[in-house]
Amino acid sequence: MDPGVSSHLRTASLDEARRLPELERVLKSGWLIKKGHATSTKKQLWAVLRRDQLSFYKDEKEYKTKFIFPTQDISAVAYYKEKSPKTFFLYLNEKIIRLIATSNEDAEEWVHVLRSTTGYRAPFSRHPISYILANSSSRTESEPNVQISDTDFDNISTEPRNQTTSPLDLETGQGDHFCTSLYDLIQFGKLRPPGINEENANYPFNPQEVNTLNKHRHSASLQNLYKLLDENKVLMQGTIHWLHGNLHRWSKCWAVVRGYGMTIYNTNREYKPVKVIPIADIQDVAEINVPESSHKYFFTVITQNKPIEFRVDNEDSLILWVAALKTSIDKANGTFTAC
């Protein structure tokens, strides 16, 4: 075997050996009651949280697992302390799990540990230049397009437009569209242009070959994003639907996300807000997965008192709304700071 290859394999084995103990380390364990959809259905199980998964056993002997939830599948944790101090909810990819702890203090500890371990916290791409899917030549005039810019906020709209994209000039950054550093908030490859398969999306896009990706007119650095948050400038805005009222009806509205929270207006004139959700009142944000065939995309803003559900038109918008809100939460909690 080539000495270089042998050395590489030994290094990889050592890295894996160091990683395994960390994955096996128990972050928290204890009894939890898992409640089903029916009020009478509940099971007391022994729960064990490790870095990569939350496991449930019949008892503390941990002989056989009853349920396993990978931590990467837990997108948010909801805890309504005033209403139900022992109860918290896990938002998973396809369902919501209700859990009841043995005491108020135990519930708070579970929530704290889970939030520090699970869900995505607006990860950043290591690619030196930030890109985003700004537009696609395959769109039609009737399809809405969300334009985002951290400098020309008046240009942000969801109005239909009919423009074609042009190849990007890497030296000047010129192109038909501009995009925000919000791309840095989402897992690399989650947004990708039509025609790019998932395997190719795992690598940085080549802007010379993919004309739908455009360089930001200014640096999309973390410092720039931190400034946007610090000055409460617009991170995301557009037309969405929200579920509200005693009859739980869907209403079309104009929403704006800034560092201090989310504001909802009747129209994009932003004359008078109909609802303001301060960032301090938002626990977390979660995507709600529904069958892909339904062509509907939802996310929930989990406030201190209740969840508020929103609907958007496409998956790209869904990712950006969630990313903008997640980052505002991270800034408020001190998780996200300028590098």
Swiss-Prot record:
It comes from Schizosaccharomyces pombe (strain 972 / ATCC 24843). Pfam families: PH. SMART domains: PH (SM00233). One of its GO terms (cellular component) is cell division site. SUPFAM superfamilies: PH domain-like. Residues 141-167 have a biased composition (Polar residues). One of its GO terms (molecular function) is phosphatidylinositol-3,4-bisphosphate binding. Disruption phenotype: Leads to off-center septation. Does not affect its3 localization to the cell membrane. InterPro entries: PH-like_dom_sf, PH_domain, PI-Interact_SigTrans_Reg. This is Pleckstrin homology domain protein opy1. PROSITE patterns: PH_DOMAIN (PS50003). Gene3D superfamilies: Pleckstrin-homology domain (PH domain)/Phosphotyrosine-binding domain (PTB) (2.30.29.30). Coiled coil: none annotated. Binds phosphatidylinositol 4,5-bisphosphate (PtdIns(4,5)P2/PIP2) at the cell membrane. It is found in: Cell tip; Cell membrane. It is a peripheral membrane protein.
